[in-house]
Amino acid sequence: LSIRRQRQMCIRDRVGNPAFEVTKGSITFYGKNLLELSPEDRSHEGIFLSFQYPVEIPGVSMVNFMRAAVNEQRKYKGLPALTASEFLKLMREKRAVVELDNKLANRSVNEGFSGGEKKRNEIFQMAMLEPRLSILDETDSGLDIDALRIVAEGVNKLKTPDTSCIVITHYQRLLDYIKPDIVHVLYKGRIVKTAGPELALELEEKGYDWIKKELGE
């Protein structure tokens, strides 16, 4: 998606950032208006956002953080909380998806993690929460080729017929690993071009100026 400020507003509106006010319109997700829900309830409804620059949370262990998140989600859905043994079993299964080292899983959230480890940790969180819609904001930013491959493979393993993923990137290299079904180009706050995966290759080769010319700019 080729957009900067508007892109951030679009994403933050969906996850409920209080710094942004929606003055008109609605965001409907599975029949519910997200604008009427708190950020945590939007998450419980199945929306996940990965950050371009994941933050560190000193003093909060990954185990406690994820157990609280998973059980709050289950409570919202009317399901019983996972026992300690059930949760640890689930955590082991999901760690394997992104090859997350057990030592990292037992440390404070993102504290002292490398850039690649932070991104891998976010895909691990995505695996634990099993969202219906994941928004990955420049997940490839700052990753070396090995970390990029592992993160992309994790995303691919989590793909199901019942889930969707919006991948925001400025580079073709991520799409060498994650094959998109549809590519959208946003310009000045609106979608101006939609096509299949071949559009990403064309953008990599030509840039974006040809789209502006098509728009008469």
Locate the predicted segments by residue.
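Conserved beta-strand-loop-alpha-helix hinge in the C-terminal portion
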Residues: 182, 186, 190-213
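Helical segment within the ABC ATPase nucleotide-binding domain
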Residues: 148-161
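Conserved H-loop
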Residues: 162-178
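Walker B catalytic motif
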Residues: 135-139, 146
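ABC-family P-loop ATPase nucleotide-binding domains
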Residues: 45, 55-132
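ABC ATPase NBD Q-loop/coupling interface
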Residues: 16, 26-42, 110
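Single conserved hydrophobic/aromatic residue that forms the stacking wall/gate
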Residues: 1-7, 11
